[in-house]
Structure formats: C-alpha cells, structure tokens
Amino acid sequence: MTNIRKTHPLLKILNSSFVDLPTPSSLSSWWNFGSLLGVCLAVQILTGLFLAMHYTADTATAFDSVTHICRDVNYGWVLRYMHANGASMFFICLYLHVGRGLYYGSYTYTETWNIGILLLFAVMATAFMGYVLPWGQMSFWGATVITNLLSAIPYIGTELVQWIWGGFSVDKATLTRFFAFHFLLPFIVTALVMVHLLFLHETGSNNPTGIPSDPDMIPFHPYYTIKDILGFLIMLTALSTLVLFSPDLLGDPDNYTPANPLNTPPHIKPEWYFLFAYAILRSIPNKLGGVLALVLSILVLAIVPVLHTSKQRSMMFRPLSQCLFWLLVATLLTLTWIGGQPVEYPYVIIGQTASVLYFMILLVLMPLTSIVENKLLKW
C-alpha cells in the first residue's frame, strides 16, 4: 500500500517539499539559514499576535500599552523582547542567507533570487513599521525622517508624504495605519516565502561547488531535517540568551522616552540592521540622490545575475573573487558602524568612501575579476 504522505492531496505537497525532496549531499551549514528564517518568521508571527492582543494603536496610549505588556501581562516582557530581538535574529539570518547566495552563485536561479529581493524589501518595510509602534522618541522621529524622504520624489513628493501620514505630521492616523500594515505584511511575507520555495523546488538547491549535483542526491528527511534542528537549537539558544540576559543591548535608550514632537533627539538613527543603508543615504548631500542610493543599495542585488561573467558558478575555487567578497563584507560592516555615528569629520568621508566602494565592488570589480579569472584558467 502506498504511504498516505505520497497520496493525500495536501500531505504530498509537504512530502515533496520537506521529506522526499532530493537534495545535494554536499550542503554546508550555510544552507541552514533558509529554514532558520522560517523559524524566525514563525516566532515573530506568534509573539506579534500575542502582543497585538494587548497593544493599542493610539498616540495617547501606545507607549503606556507597551509598558503595561512588560509590567502587568504574564510573561509580557518575554513576548516583547522575543519580538524585538527576534527581528534582529531575523535580519542576521537574512543577511547571511543573501551573503551565501552571492558567494556560491545561487543568484543564477533568477526567479528564486528576485522573489528573495522582494522578500527582503517586504521584511524591511515590516520591521520599519514595527519600530514605530512603541511610540517612543526614536519611533516618532525615525518615522518622521524616513517617511519624509519620499518628499524628494519630483512633483508628487509632498502630497505623497501627507497621504502616507494621513495629515500634516506623523500622528494618530500614521500610527493606526502602520499597525494595520505591520500586522498584515508578515502574512504577505509568508505567501511570498511559499512562492520563493516553489521556484527553488523547480530547479533544486545549488551546492557549495556550484556544479550540478543531479547524480548525487539524498532525501531531505532525515539528513537535513536533523541538520536543520541543530541550527534551530543554536539560534533559539542565542535568541533566548539575548532576551534573558541583555534584552536592550541592540535597542536605543531614546525609545524609553515617550514620543515628543517638540523635542528632537540629538542623533536620529534606525535599528542596527538598517544602519548600512542609512549610511549610504547620508553619504550623498542631495536628498533625491540619497533616496535613490538608499533604494539601489538593495536593488543592486537584482543586477548581480546579469553581471555574472565567470565560467564558474560558485566562488569556492575563485580566490580573487573571494577576496573581493570579503572586502564587500568589511565595507558593509564599516557602513553599519558609520550609520550609527554623528554627521561630522572623519565619519562623513569614511561613509562616502565605503558607499562608493560598496557599489564599485558589486557593479565593476566583481565582473572584471571574474573575467580575469577566466583568462587565468584559459577559458
């Protein structure tokens, strides 16, 4: 008799995705981050759902409702800090996942890659709107500064900003709609994740060598289910440690002051995972130019498959490209540091240099290096 998991209309979809899925036998731990992102998303939706039961999206009570969650709700502080630090874990896994894709040439699966970029934008939008909800000083001023960037769009900019605000400043209407969108977007992200997996399973997984692995496949279960569970345990241990020992390590002290439109904080900055993009934005003295650079800092990933000039897919056997890749990582870490610093010498010039280098590596140096490597191998 055929197993029910192979015949049942619903179960056979799950079976072909997580049980009998043919998977390359050589996948390293860098392939764990996809499933870790799934766990992060589940944790965020669950904790977010329980937080939404106690939160009130009103400028008069939002800050107090978050305080109430932390002080009066049973284990409310765990929910709140799991959600806040869960977002940090989400972005750590997200950036490592994208980095893996760049290093091993996974971007040649263009549909999967482009859905991934769409997912990155959706998660960033969700995180930004979530940061506004506690209605602290950094929530309010972060929302004001970032939404104001849209006013740089020619002709329609000012009207667009007022339309998003629901008035002439960030106020009650803005908070209410941000809460609505923050609640809705994770479910859209979940749907996009399914499309992402659908396209991935059309082609099968890439592997560290970048060589087709059709002759050497193993079933996903039990090999990679066990491997993924180890990843889950490591990540959840790290998250729990962060939540239970230093929950405010990655937050901003300014957000413990209720929002005050009459008092601007000395340094307005987003959460750490947006600092690299914020540094790129600030490195251009023109408003519209800065906004374009900000969008392109992520959108540039969409051009990467077009600029793949190497005869090899993965960087595993390409030492020159590897050096460039790690230079790119160092550049991003530098940008993250600069994004948290005040706008003064020498931070401005370091930020501008790192921004130029970031785009240079991805758009010019990597394709040229690949051509040089092809020549060295007489290909």
UniProtKB/Swiss-Prot annotation:
Heme b b566 binds at H97, H196. Its cofactor is heme b. A ubiquinone binds at H201. One of its GO terms (cellular component) is mitochondrial inner membrane. Heme b b562 binds at H83, H182. Its main location: mitochondrion. GO terms for biological process: mitochondrial electron transport, ubiquinol to cytochrome c. The chain crosses the membrane at residues 33-53, 77-98, 113-133, 178-198, 226-246, 288-308, 320-340, 347-367. It comes from the Eukaryota. It holds the Pfam family Cytochrom_B_C. It is found in: Mitochondrion inner membrane. One of its GO terms (molecular function) is ubiquinol-cytochrome-c reductase activity. It is a multi-pass membrane protein. SUPFAM superfamilies: a domain/subunit of cytochrome bc1 complex (Ubiquinol-cytochrome c reductase), Transmembrane di-heme cytochromes. Binds 2 heme b groups non-covalently. Heme 1 (or BL or b562) is low-potential and absorbs at about 562 nm, and heme 2 (or BH or b566) is high-potential and absorbs at about 566 nm. Component of the ubiquinol-cytochrome c reductase complex (complex III or cytochrome b-c1 complex) that is part of the mitochondrial respiratory chain. The b-c1 complex mediates electron transfer from ubiquinol to cytochrome c. Contributes to the generation of a proton gradient across the mitochondrial membrane that is then used for ATP synthesis. The cytochrome bc1 complex contains 11 subunits: 3 respiratory subunits (MT-CYB, CYC1 and UQCRFS1), 2 core proteins (UQCRC1 and UQCRC2) and 6 low-molecular weight proteins (UQCRH/QCR6, UQCRB/QCR7, UQCRQ/QCR8, UQCR10/QCR9, UQCR11/QCR10 and a cleavage product of UQCRFS1). This cytochrome bc1 complex then forms a dimer. This is Cytochrome b.
